[in-house]
Every structure is written in structure tokens, then in C-alpha cells.
Swiss-Prot record:
Source superkingdom: Bacteria
GO molecular function: metal ion binding; metalloendopeptidase activity
Alphabetical keyword list: Cell membrane, Hydrolase, Membrane, Metal-binding, Metalloprotease, Protease, Transmembrane, Transmembrane helix, Zinc
Residue intervals passing through the bilayer: 6-26, 175-195, 346-366, 394-414
The protein's name in its UniProt record: Regulator of sigma-W protease RasP
EC number: 3.4.24.-
Needed co-factor(s): Zn(2+)
Extra facts: Regulated intramembrane proteolysis (RIP) occurs when an extracytoplasmic signal triggers a concerted proteolytic cascade to transmit information and elicit cellular responses. A membrane-spanning regulatory substrate protein is first cut extracytoplasmically (site-1 protease, S1P), then within the membrane itself (site-2 protease, S2P, this enzyme), while cytoplasmic proteases finish degrading the regulatory protein, liberating the effector protein.
Length: 422
């Protein structure tokens, strides 16, 4: 069971992160931004392959992911005056590769001492060839050229391929696409569940009965149409639930229409405690379901909206103090919930995945620096001001945001450990 839970956790969390980052990747590529890496997880690489311009990687720690876009790189490679570099050329006599070190491994490279280098706008390098130190040469650099550092290729990004070069509305779309993709994923999962298992209906009928439940023991069957309970007409499934809850361990006269006949069956609901410790009745029947494309589409939409509202309500309670910080869950808590839900069946596991996907989308839209919501806030401010925020100031605010998130992660992880193991 432990192995099954680990696999389920990795698949669910990995899928949510994959689609989130896929949203960023697709919109960034559509805007013409060079995406250097698409990563699932953080830390050391476990697996990687390159397709077109992007390296796709799976990393050791399954706690998130990222899309590394040109212009946002923390390790920018610079070619400054006085540097000695090697140049390799394509068939059009444009520089195809700029060799930063280990030039001895490339005997065909033209070695120059750099005088000037503009690898963002003009795409030119000037310098002095060895043996021609009195003659300044100029070289055009291809827009699809590479640096070679320690034997590895790093694509050079002209300014028009960098994140910051794009209109603010394109950058907003690239950042917002991640959380939006999580909402789309949740909606698709819920629609699929609606198509496969049916959509809950409010008709006054019985759905699937639980084994050894009071309804099954009394002789009720799935599909029975409940006309009345104790003489009171039942107009909906909601009416049935209310009547059953009000009669714990009390015999009820249930009028049932079955095969065009009316039957009277006595049922005594089991007494159970609800979430508020109040005693209510339960007789072991699920809500009826109906199948159809339109009903599944509507179910996906309404369920996505309902879950979103519930999460936002809890977030507002967290701000007002009605919802305590120690009630939040981190990766450890989510793992435990995955374990509990996995035991109840694959359908509930998919519903849980949809809930987590919406949760991930909402959390990432919070205006906290280092999250997508924080980046969107900076971009909206830029759109209003007409110019970007100072990069150093933005970097400082993002650093504070990262520190806050790390602290929050430690707190919720400690809460999970205390709640589950101590």
C-alpha cells in the first residue's frame, strides 16, 4: 500500500505540475520567447532530453517545476572586451558557435581577442585574430548561435527572443497560462468523471446502495422512485436526505414506486455523528446519477466554480483569523490525504486530483512575490506605469517572497508532522 500511495502521489502531483508548466511553455513559445528548460521538480537532474530549443528534464525533488525563459536566466554568459574566444562558422559565414573555454578541443575554431560584442541587438563580434593583432575584424553572429561552455551548448538569445522584449500583454499571458491550465485540467477531469460515472441528479430516486446499509437491508433497490416518507411527499433527492437525517434510529414508512407499482417499505436509518458532532440518520444510499454529454459539461463547470468558491472562502477566513495556520497542509499532509483517498477508489482519487489542481491554480495566483500572482502584479504595475519596475527592486521583493514561502513551507510541514506522527 505504501508503494501504491507513493506512486499515486508522484503521478498526481507530477501531472498537476506538468500541465501548469506546460501552460507557461506554450504561451511563451507562441510569443517567440526562447525557453531553455522545461523542468518537473527541483534539484539534481534524473532524466533529460532536448527537443528543438528546449531541454526537458525531470529533477529529484517533486515539489514543483519551472520553465527557464531567456532573459530570466540567473547565469547569464557575457563576452567582454579582452576575452579570448573561439568562433565556428556556418555555411553563410555567420558565427554559429562562440567557444568560451577549452578552445584547444576545437582546432577548426578561429581564435580572437574580443574588442566589442553585441549578442542581443546588432548580433556582431569584433576582435583581433591571432597573428593579425593590428587588424580589427568584424563577424556577424547567427540568431540561432550557441555558446560552448565546458563542452556544453547554451543557445544565445537575441533580445527579441528574451522575455523582457515582449509586449507586457504577451508576458502577462505567458505567466497567467500556468494557473489557467490548472483550472482547465480540473474541468477536464470533472467532465470525464461525469461522462464515466454520471452526474449527480436531484431526482427523488435512490442511487447506488452501500453494502450492509439500512436501505439495502430493508429491501430498497437502486433506481427506486421515492414518492413519500412518513406520508410527506418527496420532490427531490435533497428532500430524501433531509428526511433521513431527521430520523436516526426511527422507523420510517417509505412509499416507493417500482415497476409501476407502489410499495411501502419500513426503513430505520442508522444513527451517526456529522462533522458538528450532531446525531443524524443515514441509510446507505448515494444520490442518483444521470449520464449525458451536456450534463457532464455542466457538471464540470459548476463543480470547478464551487470548489474555487470554497477554497477562496477558506483563504479569506485565513486572513480574518477564522481559519488557523496550523490547519494548512504541505506536501506531507497532501501525501497523507492521497493515501486516505486512494483507499476509497480511483474515482475519488481523480476528484481529489481535480481539487488539488484548482488549489494549485489559486495559490499560484496569490499576489505573493516568487509566485505567478506576484509576477503578474509587477506586470500589471508596469502596464499602468508604462515602464517596468527597477530590476534590483523587483529582485529584492522576490527574495523576500521566496524567504516567506520557505518559512511557510517549514511551518506547514511541521504542522503535518505533528498532526500525523507526534
Amino acid at each position: 500500500m505504501f508503494v501504491n500511495t507513493v506512486i499515486a502521489f508522484i503521478i498526481i502531483f507530477g501531472t498537476l505540475v506538468f500541465f501548469h508548466e506546460l501552460g507557461h511553455l506554450l504561451l511563451a513559445q507562441r510569443a517567440g520567447i526562447l525557453c531553455r528548460e522545461f523542468a518537473i521538480g527541483f534539484g539534481p537532474k534524473i532524466f533529460s532530453f532536448k527537443k528543438n530549443e528546449t531541454v526537458y528534464t525531470i529533477r529529484l525533488l517533486p515539489v514543483g517545476g519551472f520553465v527557464r525563459m531567456a532573459g530570466e536566466d540567473p547565469e547569464m554568459i557575457e563576452v567582454k572586451p579582452g576575452y579570448t574566444v573561439g568562433l565556428l562558422f556556418n555555411k553563410e559565414d555567420q558565427v554559429e558557435k562562440v567557444i568560451i573555454n577549452q578552445k584547444e578541443k576545437y582546432p577548426d575554431a578561429l581564435v580572437i581577442e574580443v574588442e566589442t560584442a553585441d549578442l542581443e541587438h546588432d548580433m556582431k563580434i569584433t576582435g583581433y585574430e591571432q597573428g593579425k593583432e593590428d587588424e580589427l575584424s568584424s563577424f556577424t553572429v547567427s540568431e540561432t548561435s550557441f555558446f560552448i561552455v565546458d563542452g556544453e551548448e547554451v543557445q544565445i538569445a537575441p533580445y527579441n527572443r528574451q522575455f523582457g522584449s515582449k509586449p507586457v500583454w504577451q508576458r502577462i499571458k505567458a505567466i497567467a497560462a500556468g494557473p489557467i491550465m490548472n483550472f482547465i485540467l480540473a474541468y477536464v477531469i470533472l467532465v470525464m468523471l461525469g461522462l464515466i460515472q454520471g452526474v449527480p441528479s436531484n431526482e427523488p430516486m435512490l442511487g447506488q446502495l452501500t453494502d450492509n446499509g439500512r436501505a439495502a437491508e430493508a429491501g430498497l433497490k437502486e433506481g427506486d422512485y421515492i414518492q413519500s416518507i412518513n406520508g410527506e411527499k418527496m420532490r427531490s433527492w435533497t428532500d430524501i436526505v433531509s428526511a433521513v437525517k431527521e430520523n436516526p434510529e426511527k422507523e420510517m414508512d417509505v412509499a416507493v414506486k417500482r415497476d409501476n407499482k407502489t410499495l411501502h417499505i419500513s426503513v430505520t436509518p442508522e444513527a451517526v455523528k456529522d462533522e458538528n458532532k450532531k446525531t443524524i440518520g443515514r441509510f446507505g444510499s448515494y444520490a442518483p446519477t444521470e449520464k449525458g454529454v451536456l450534463s457532464a459539461v455542466a457538471y464540470g463547470a459548476t463543480s470547478t466554480v464551487d470548489v474555487t468558491k470554497a477554497i477562496l472562502t477558506n483563504l479569506s477566513k485565513l486572513v480574518t483569523g477564522q481559519f488557523k495556520l496550523d490547519m494548512l497542509s504541505g506536501p506531507v499532509g497532501i501525501y497523507d490525504m492521497t493515501d486516505q483517498v486512494a483507499k476509497t477508489g480511483i474515482v475519488n482519487l481523480f476528484q481529489f486530483a481535480a481539487f488539488l489542481s484548482i488549489n494549485l491554480g489559486i495559490v499560484n495566483l496569490l499576489p505573493i512575490p516568487a509566485l505567478d500572482g506576484g509576477r503578474l502584479l509587477f506586470l500589471f504595475i508596469e502596464a499602468i506605469r508604462g515602464k517596468p519596475i527597477n530590476r534590483e527592486k523587483e529582485a529584492f521583493v522576490v527574495f523576500i517572497g521566496v524567504a516567506f514561502l520557505m518559512l511557510l513551507m517549514l511551518v506547514v510541514t511541521w504542522n503535518d508532522i505533528q498532526r500525523l506522527f507526534l
